[in-house]
Amino acid sequence: MSKVLVVKSSILATFSQSNPLADHFIDQWREQHLNDDITVRDLGAQPVPELDGELVGALRPSDATLTQRQQQALELSDALIGELQANDVLVFTAPMYNFAIPSKLKNYFDLIARASVTFRYSEQGPERLVKNKRALILTTRDGIHKDTSSDLVTHYLRLFLGFIGITDVSFIYAEGVAYGPEAAVKAQEEAKASIQSFVSA
């Protein structure tokens, strides 16, 4: 039995191209893995706060008294990290917005990147503290960017996830969705077929 965490990051609600892919993954996984638990976190519907000068102080080891906002941020960070660590398969939607990931997903990453919790530094360099996970990235793009210099999303996600210890990372792309209705449907269908292959593997 596996535990699966699905993190949605689109801000477009019913107009999203990535949410249908996440929903398709959930349906396919439940169909083929009847006893597995799936947790869904929708950052578009329930965003996490952006770190500022006050909140970032709550995430660093310190004996200082925390403000109410800091305490809330620390508790949320603990909950998000606990959720991440409790699951075996991690699925992130990552639509490309202006060549980058959504700010809501970046805010989430900022809350789970905790020194001495998800990574730590030693004399040998950074040590990864998130173990035995595999991740799937569902990334949608208006244009065609895969394997080009404009695909900053793939590089960033591999770098960030690898830094905390998630090195088994697969990507499924739906590209050219702004090239017209037929192109969007084709991109969705191809991505859903790739999801089916991932789920069945």
Swiss-Prot record:
Its EC number is 1.6.5.-, 1.7.1.17. Binds 1 FMN per subunit. It comes from the Bacteria. One of its GO terms (molecular function) is oxidoreductase activity, acting on NAD(P)H, quinone or similar compound as acceptor. Belongs to the azoreductase type 1 family. PANTHER family: FMN-DEPENDENT NADH-AZOREDUCTASE 1 (PTHR43741), FMN-DEPENDENT NADH:QUINONE OXIDOREDUCTASE (PTHR43741:SF2). This is FMN-dependent NADH:quinone oxidoreductase. The lineage of its organism: Bacteria, Pseudomonadati, Pseudomonadota, Gammaproteobacteria, Enterobacterales.
